[in-house]
Curated annotation (Swiss-Prot):
Gene Ontology BP term (one): tricarboxylic acid cycle
Pathway in which this enzyme or protein is active: Carbohydrate metabolism; tricarboxylic acid cycle; isocitrate from oxaloacetate: step 1/2
UniProt-recorded name of the protein: Citrate synthase
GO cellular component terms, A-Z: cytoplasm
Top-level taxon: Bacteria
InterPro entries the record matches: Citrate_synth-like_lrg_a-sub, Citrate_synth-like_sm_a-sub, Citrate_synthase, Citrate_synthase_AS, Citrate_synthase_bac-typ, Citrate_synthase_sf, Citrate_synthase_typ-I
Catalytic activity: oxaloacetate + acetyl-CoA + H2O = citrate + CoA + H(+)
GN (gene name): gltA
GO terms, molecular function: citrate (Si)-synthase activity
Residues annotated as catalytic: 248, 306
Family per record: Belongs to the citrate synthase family.
EC assignment: 2.3.3.16
Top-rank EC class of the record's enzyme: transferase
Species of the source: Bartonella bacilliformis
Keywords, ordered alphabetically: Transferase, Tricarboxylic acid cycle
Amino acid sequence: YIDGDEGILLYHGYSIDQLAENGDFLETCYLLLYGELPNKQQKIDFDRCIMRHTMVHEQFARFFHGFRRDSHPMAVMVACLGAMSAFYHDSINITDPQQRMIASIRLISKVPTLAAMAYKYSIGQPFVYPRNDLNYATNFLHMCFSVPCEEHKISPVIARAMDRIFTLHADHEQNASTSTVRLAGSSGANPYACIAAGVACLWGPAHGGANEACLKMLQEIGSVKKIPEFIARAKDKNDPFRLMGFGHRVYKNYDPRAKIMQKTCHEVLQELNIQDDPLLDIAMELEHIALNDEYFINKKLYPNVDFYSGITLKALGFPTE
């Protein structure tokens, strides 16, 4: 449920603030799948079920070698998700509730593995297998950033930030990618094909690509000294330039996800002791201006979730693309 005027986002009656601060992503997944939060035993069983299915078919390793190493990760993800219907064709009957649930479990458990493999392939490092003894977010970061030749420890602050990013993006009513998935599903297409279509839609700069576009804008600005010039351009109706990461088509108030992401972003920067990154300096100054400039306040152009998530993901070590 979304109330754009009041800046409210609820998942089955629970505010996004409650879920992000007091729960975790898999708890949110359970809520979205079953309509209620799990009790202690249900949470243990659900977490165990997800973590036991994180490995992907070994042939996927060969599948990746068909891509150029400089392929955009979203192109790789669309292909991999579509390919899941070939590797896991025992759960593609969309009319069977049990098969739909199996497909849902497989998607939640295996997509982080495929995403990490896409990243590792792009930088020429060996794939890292998932570890069932780690929680969901920590496991994803482990697969992305650990290497076989040395031990890699992940800070709880960093893992918590990743988990919050997952939770904040778990659902957003009838957005473009959700509409795409539902449209594909209306034809009776299998769940993996439907999700692949949704990921293709998510690739667009007006949707999931917004945080990437925001970081590219920060690169275009180049330095803190040039911010006033770009602010003036953003206010000029005749200039095609616009600030990415500010305002939202649904929220006419502060994006509730942005408040959580803002806090998370600053926690990550403090944990990693990042103080001299020029892009982050530009972002922090832009944030300060947007929250104090009458033009932005009157037009309700507050920093949105994409503004903070892009900065946070960059700080965590993910490349812009």
